[in-house]
UniProtKB/Swiss-Prot annotation:
This is Ribonuclease 3. The gene is drsh-1. Residues 1-20, 149-244 are annotated as: Disordered. Its EC number is 3.1.26.3. The lineage of its organism: Eukaryota, Metazoa, Ecdysozoa, Nematoda, Chromadorea. It comes from Caenorhabditis briggsae. SUPFAM superfamilies: dsRNA-binding domain-like, RNase III domain-like.
Amino acid sequence: MDFTEIHKRSRRKKFQQIHQDRKDEMIQQLGRRFHNQPSTSATYPSAVEDIPLPSEVPNVFGAPPPLTNADFHRNFLVDPDVVVSHSASLIRSNRHIVKAEDAEQYMMVSRERVGTTAERVLEDFNSRVIKPLKAKRRLQIDVPYIDHPLHSMRSKTPERKENEEDSDSEIRSSDSSSDAEYGSDVEEEPDSCRRKKRTHKIQKADSSQTKVEEKERQNTLLRMGIERKRNHPNAIDPHISYNEKGLGNDSPECRCPFPIRNRGLKHGYYAGENQVLKCSKNDRANLHYYTLHVTPAPNESQIQKTQMLINGMEYHFEGFTMVTHAPLPDCMTRRPVFKYSIDYEFQLIEEFMPTECFDPEDCNSIFEYIFHDIFELLDFDLYPKHLPPGTASCPTIHIVPRFVAMENNTTFIWSSKTVLAFFLLHGKNNMFSPEDVEKNCAMSDDAFGRTIAKLKQSIVLNPMKKPSALRADWFSRDLENKEMFLIQNTIRSQNFASPFLPQIAALEKKMSRLKQEKKDSGNKNPHYENLKAELIVLKDKHREARQLKLKLPVKDYIDTGLKPDVVAHVAMAIIASHHIRYNFSLSVFEKVIEYKFNDRRIVELALIHSSFRSYYGTTPDHVKNMISNCGYRKKYGAEERREKKKGIISLFNIMGGETSGGEPILHNERLEYLGDAVVELIASHHLFFILNHHFEGGLATYRTALVQNRNLAKLAMNCRIDEMLQFAHGADLINEAEWKHALANAFEALMAGVFLDSGIAPCDAIFSKAMYGKDPEMKKVWDHLNEHELKIEDPLGDRDLSRITPALTDFHRLEQIIGIEFNNIRLLAKAFTRRNVPFNDLTKGHNQRLEWLGDSVLQLIISDYLYRNFPLHHEGHMSLLRTSLVSNQTQSVVCDDLGFQEFVIKAPHRKNDLKMKDKADLVEAFIGALYVDKGLEYCRSFIRTVFCPRLKHFINSEKWNDAKSHLQQWCLAIRDSRNPNPAMPEYRLLGIQGPTNNRIFRVAVYFRGERLSSAAASNMHTAELKAAENALAALEKASFSRMREKYMSGRQHRLHRIFFS
């Protein structure tokens, strides 16, 4: 057993031990966090008696304490820069570049080398290299593809009918025998309801059976696709993957229905690519040249590189030049925002290139030869797809190989003619002729090694095989039969499963069961060690089975002249091509929305769907196969294992800021979280001022209609977001409902991006144009906002009234407390006028409309603060923090701290007692009045100063988690990781008591069919929260009992089982 295997096995055991330790301490951690005790995860108790019992806490989810001077340790009005993944702006190079005339003459003048001229090199290349290659490729046997069904455009979950009852009602109404004591309080269900529920159960069972059958059918088709590739007559080996047009390693790359195949980035349709592109030798000066710089250099620390020695100068392959027909946008990002699973990055550098070095026809032939004929990237196409079929056009980007040499601060670069001559020199003949094979077989071993050393790690090509191109690691010979073979050391494809995997899985399951029996009984099972040894042997065999050594005859193989360093440049060129075309599309998009981004990184992020995890610019399997078959060889098992980020402990650590480092979140869900608040405020603002006589209930109804996904999806399509959204090429967004939901989220993310880039005003303009751009009259009504009625009466302010009106004079003291002076002090008075106050000419009504508006303002400013200051938090984490900050409890504390109760304008003969909800409404109404009088910036300063310092309390005490969420996380922590549908807490209504104006709801919480606790309250939500708190207290006591049992010795463990079980 080698050292690598020992190291890997020890590392695997280390991760298994870490996972087991985390699982063992999880419930103890949850109990500690529930009661806000200091961490005990660093060291375990030394004895059972040292484990602390939980303290009795009546209510752990209380309001935050009042603010002190220590809470203002930082300036909450100053934000860090918005975290993005890459820096922007293009780089311009100042290198002195000239054409390598000597190299061109050397390659073409000598008849022994190429035997052509600069005028005839393209013709000779096509006739002596391309034509024979395509003729040989046509000799391959055409095996029909496996016919896979297209993805369905219907929704995976059928829409509910309006009269169809929710499944939760069935869960809540169905009760066990333990609920009999409350059975008299619940009315008996009619027969029609029972029939509907039985029908629903039958339909659900049929749907589950259909899903199982569909999954089995898909697995069968996948296996058939894999077997087809394994048994292909032209495959060089059953365990080596190869590329075919439109096909991945196991199934077709695109299974989209025909109606949607002519749209979207995933099908190669880029916005704005609807013009015929033509360039010729005479137009070369109007083209734009950008060097694709790949870091780290692919040939760094490598012996074998793509290079050629000419007249004492060493020309090496530097990468590719990307030639475009228009200059790249000035605000274009250096690199794309999305991720790709390749260990390289690239930058586009604007650089001068001699016009005589570029010829469009030469470059098109070189591109076809490298990308399609050698590496078989058959789905990679640079021609615009919006043009009618048969329309002749240049590709959107010309990709030119760069061979350079440096001398005296001057860079000499090959022309496209010289590159053609290079490939003609290597590709016109086979790598070894029969005479060469016979000569090499007659050599001594030392001479043979020196002869073929220069061919080591060459990329060789045989167009009659699949894959056509391979990396030749070494060459061997059969002296008896006078034959030569190329050797490649590789790894079998993961699609071709090892026969040892089922046996390994069965043994691991059996060992896990024996380990649990040993833990329970304390007796060692004699079969355990035998199974462990057998498992080690099987894993060694599995490892050996993954490794593969190919030995192929050299007949019909040609040397392309390329080495594995070219592979990384090719992969980066594909991604860079998408990046360039996408940024040209963004320029069209900016014209549509009539807004130019200062930083395009934010709009790129806003248009990346969460399914878009990694992208290669073409079929992912094609790029992976190219890297595996032709790239530098990687050691098997050398990849780093990343720690999983899921789990309740990780959640608490993230929320508490205890994570070190972290990767940026490269999709639009964080922006969608912020954009939801932006869109809500825009809609609230317009409705508030347009419908100035509508009550808050009607305004809320209209706002719901405006911000619903159906409407936002239409606005997204009006902005052509459907042409710009980047998402995975699969079945996720095929059906119409999910597609519209994704468009709505993308529109909200776009609003957030514009808000972060320039503020709320451009967001308002884009929303207005998207909503009513096709109806000028309606757009005029939407854009024309009336002033508030109190401001209309006194356009210059009404502070003079406070001198003669005692009711207004009292608010001067409040202005001194908060440090803000209102222009219209009657607005401030209206914010403190409750609903039960009769209508009067002073305030013109109560504060409910202002409270409705202030809620939207508060949501946006808190969301903006969390987005900017917690860049590594997901949208779910930020939602938890926002909920804790804008809750009624927090707002009631703010109301008490600022003394708002003293200034409430109440009705005559009414008590001044305010409930928690009343105090919260008072704060929101004040924010609404401040927004109407002073604008968003004053609200931002007030909310950042009053609310945001309290966030530290919620983070440190971990009270951002309510009881129901906490109980759900507890149940998830003890789930079986192999179960895709873990059990969740169920809340059931046991009974309703009392008159209609004073109802008491009794609720019980169940887990895995057992009741955990019950509680009663005046509404369902509060009753569920109390039931969850009671369940947590009971579960915590039980968890500490189990932890004590864990630290017992074997004898103590058995005695405990005997006496206490």
